[in-house]
From Swiss-Prot:
Residues 2-44 form the Helicase C-terminal domain. Belongs to the helicase family. Yeast subtelomeric Y' repeat subfamily. This is Putative uncharacterized helicase-like protein YBL112C. Induction: Upon SUB2 overexpression. It comes from Saccharomyces cerevisiae (strain ATCC 204508 / S288c) (Baker's yeast). It holds the Pfam family Helicase_C. InterPro entries: Helicase_C-like, P-loop_NTPase. Transmembrane segments: none annotated. Coiled coil: none annotated.
């Protein structure tokens, strides 16, 4: 099994065959970077984002896209692209993000 561990730089330009897991540490990803990172996976692989709750908010700079939020990523992608949301319905593509409020080791 191929596993990729890295910063948000792994979201751009890397193509690894049979990649089944991506682990990104203490990142401040926005929706575009998240989509690029998850796009590296094949055949239902897993993506783990590990960070502290206040690490993203503290580093957000003026003019950048807002970082992703804890909760349903599918809804955030729909909002970003201006797509209609079906409130209360979570299909198989909806996956959740929980941020840890403790140091990442």
């Amino acid at each position: 099994m191929q596993v990729l561990i890295g910063t948000k730089l792994v979201t751009e330009g890397i193509d690894i065959k049979q990649l089944m897991m991506v682990i990104m540490l203490d990142n401040r990803l926005n929706i575009i970077e998240l989509i690029q990172g998850v796009g590296r996976l094949r055949d239902g692989g897993l993506c783990y984002l590990l960070s502290r709750k206040n690490s993203w908010a503290a580093r957000n700079r003026k003019g950048e896209l807002p970082p992703i939020k804890e909760g349903c990523i599918t809804e955030q992608v729909r909002e970003f692209y201006g797509l209609e949301s079906k409130k209360g319905k979570k299909g198989p593509a909806c996956w959740m993000l929980w941020l840890q409020d403790r140091p990442v080791c």
